[in-house]
Curated annotation (Swiss-Prot):
Keyword vocabulary terms for this entry: Cytoplasm, Exonuclease, Hydrolase, Nuclease
Residues of the active site: 134
Gene field: orn
The keyword Zinc is assigned to this record: no
HAMAP family the UniProt entry points to: Oligoribonuclease
Subcellular location, record wording: Cytoplasm
Name of the molecule in the record: Oligoribonuclease
UniProt function note: 3'-to-5' exoribonuclease specific for small oligoribonucleotides.
Primary localization: cytoplasm
Length: 210
């Protein structure tokens, strides 16, 4: 008997942040975007795209590179004009998750090179951190593996823009994962093939696990 999985159990929560820098002790989140996808990477709902206000003192912590980046993208002026607090942005993402995901089965966080984003979420949006599964889907892992195992896939990946805005970065990450799925992760092996692969992998590394 095939078990039917409720669609909300298969959701991915895509989040991207823009910050004033990468150091947790002195930098802050200034833009939050979130989208939900189903198991086939279809985007569900409208998502969240919010610029968070930062004080002049917080903005003064940006180095020249980040200042130039956020100025070129138009984000810096939006930060100054924003009246949205980080708590309000966190509330909006939590509401999105509550609407589209199963609270009994927290969805993984997904994105590109998301370790830093998760660190900022954990430190500055702890309620959101608790609403996410501890597992993460990092598209950059497939990028690194394709470079080593499937160079044609690696060199033909979709071009990425340089907008440095949170929502655009999320959409590009979803598109990139969809590309890897279509170009590389396309086979659905038979049970026999999967069992053979398991046996071969087990045999190859058994000596290191004794």
């Amino acid at each position: 008997m095939v078990e039917t999985v409720h669609p909300k159990n298969d959701r991915l929560v895509w989040i991207d942040l823009e910050m004033t820098g990468l150091e947790l002790d002195r930098h802050v989140i200034v833009e939050v975007a979130a989208l939900i996808t189903d198991a086939d990477l279809n985007i569900i709902g409208e998502g969240v795209d919010l610029v968070v206000h930062a004080t002049p003192e917080q903005l003064a912590e940006m180095d020249d590179f980040v200042t130039t980046m956020h100025t070129s993208s138009g984000l810096l002026e939006e930060i100054k004009a924003s009246t949205v607090s980080l708590q309000e942005a966190e509330d909006a993402v939590l509401a999105l998750i509550a609407q589209h995901c199963d609270p009994e089965h927290p969805a993984p966080l997904a994105g590109n090179s998301i370790a830093t984003d998760r660190s900022f979420i954990r430190a500055q949006m702890p309620r959101l951190d608790k609403a996410l599964h501890y597992r993460m889907v990092d598209v950059s892992s497939l990028k690194e593996l394709s470079r080593r195992w499937a160079p044609r896939v690696y060199f033909n990946q979709p071009d990425k823009g340089m907008a440095h805005r949170a929502l655009a970065d999320i959409v590009e990450s979803i598109r990139e994962l969809d590309y890897y799925r279509r170009a590389w992760l396309i086979s659905d092996p038979t049970t026999e093939d999967a069992e053979d692969a398991k046996a071969n992998a087990t045999a190859s590394y058994q000596q290191f696990l004794q």
